[in-house]
Amino acid sequence: MWFKNGVPTLGELTVESVAGTTGNTVITVSPKPIGGHKLVYKTAASTAPSVAYDDDLSKWTEFNNGDEITATNGHKITVAEVTADGKARKSGSADVVSGE
């Protein structure tokens, strides 16, 4: 957990999107989630979805690091590391690169 002036703050993830099969991208994230946490993502056409510490992201899509997911080339993706109950702890964004 990161703190700024005694207040918990959102940590950072490095997110990479590389072309997968047609219409898909392979998403890799570092660092890997800590024990008990999981990765979730959300895409948007023009602006990467924003995340704040402790946001409830339980409605976002869960995935495993290195998975191939369906996403539109050129869209934005935000990946977050969340607690078991979906509370945001880290996030990062990237431009989607999908296979053509």
Q: Which residue ranges define each predicted feature?
A:
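Extracellular recognition modules
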Residues: 1-3, 76-82
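Solvent-exposed strand-loop boundary residues in beta-sheet-rich modules
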Residues: 6, 44-47, 83-85
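Proline-enriched interdomain boundary motifs that mark the N-terminal boundary
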Residues: 8-16
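Short coil/turn motif common to extracellular beta-sandwich-like domains
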Residues: 18-29
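Solvent-exposed loop/turn segments flanking beta-strands in beta-repeat/beta-sandwich domains
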Residues: 32-52
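Surface-exposed, short loops/turns at beta-strand junctions within beta-sandwich domains
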Residues: 63-76
